[in-house]
Amino acid sequence: MFWTVFASSYTGLTDMSTEPLAKNLRPELGDFVSIIGFRSLLKGLREAVGEKTALVVAIAAGRARGRELADSFGLAGKEPELDKITSCLQQALGINGTRFCLIDKIEAIDDGYRVYCRETIGSAGEAQGSTGKLTFTLGTIQGTLESIMNKRLRGKQVESVLLGGTHDVIEFEVLG
């Protein structure tokens, strides 16, 4: 039950289908929830199941969302250029989409990919010097890349705007 409530509260999909987000799910309040509400959900999750389990669950939920995005883009398994993936993620997650975060660039690195994000939910409103990490955001991007590039990845945040970076940077290592 939690999984369905968690996922549907963010995706707007109650059946967990891969259809793109519907529009006008709520006639007066609109389709999206606030950062405050989303972060409260993550905080409650940490309090209920513990920090490590919450991290795993948030990343897994993000990966599921990322796979939905890849399917909605029609790019699952197609391995397009990284500029195309960047453009799709910008459209879906950025100012014209869910306003989840801004993706400035995805680049290939020796053993995987590096993604440059701004205005992420994980960093919004956090104090400078905070050691909080991206979880759902990392998972969303990971799930999208895994599905599109048909590769298993391991992600980690390597830079943070909270620690003086210009971006929240996530690196994904290709496994096997």
Give the residues covered by each predicted segment.
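Active-site helix/loop of acyl-thioester processing domains in fatty-acid/polyketide metabolism
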Residues: 135-150
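N-terminal accessory segment detector
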Residues: 1-135, 154, 159-169, 173-176
